[in-house]
Amino acid sequence: MDINFNNPTIYCSHSIRGNGSKTMEENCRYACRVADKIERVFPEISLYVPARSDLSLQVLWDAKKISVDDIMYADLEILRACHGWLWINTGPSDGCEEECLEACCVVDEPEDNIIKQDILKANYNATRRILDPIVNAAVRRFRNV
């Protein structure tokens, strides 16, 4: 399948099952809130956020029709089609670690795209300062495709 995005798109890794400190619902809700804020601050880009797109996967997972490996395969295919990558780091996550390795190798993103600050608590200027390098690199990649 050939995946093409119509505007600069950044894959947003986030904890789903994570390290057990929060529920899946809490992790996904937090990721969506952070992504919404980032997209308000940077209207020139889109974020691909697994929490926004995984309802069908969740149905299949609950019915035991797919495995973690199946989900990771799909996520990595989507990541490869994106123009950038960042990780909303909410704690240890095997899936995010795998996405980080893929992003560093294929998308050629540096590991410092791991966002350790709580973007929800950052003001507009701080959010721009933290994410400007990631967004600018994604926009450049999009223009060069």
Cite the ranges covered by each PLM segment:
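Conserved catalytic or regulatory cores that recognize and/or transform ribose-phosphate-containing ligands
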Residues: 1-145
